[in-house]
Amino acid sequence: MQVKIHELAANELNEAIEWYELQSKGLGRHFKKSVIEHIDKIKMNPDWFLIEADTIHKAYIPKFPYKILFTKESNKSITIWAIAHLHRKPWYWQNRIT
């Protein structure tokens, strides 16, 4: 399944990786690995994940206060709209979805 990542979601991911790496060497890599593993799980079965709103699904990242927000565009692709921190600005990402 093809994965499209919104530009701002990619920025969020990179900022979080950098922040975690500054907190503890290797922690940023661990966060990135966890996100990639969850994206792989989303690709295998996107319908398994809970609905956040309308057609937006959410996948929580274990051990980190983040969730991946995505839509299933077809049986062949998903779009990741946000890599959102759980304790900051809820619903800020909604204006990204057209």
Regions found by a protein language model. Name each.
Residues 1-32:
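Arg/Lys-rich, positively charged N-terminal/basic patches that mediate binding to nucleic acids
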Residues 15, 33, 37-40, 44:
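Generic recognition of well-ordered alpha-helical segments
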Residues 25, 40, 44-47, 88:
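Generic structural signal for secondary-structure transition and capping sites
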Residues 37, 44-78:
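Basic/aromatic recognition patch in beta-strand/loop cores that engages polyanionic ligands
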Residues 67, 71-98:
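Enriched for short, Lys/Arg-rich terminal
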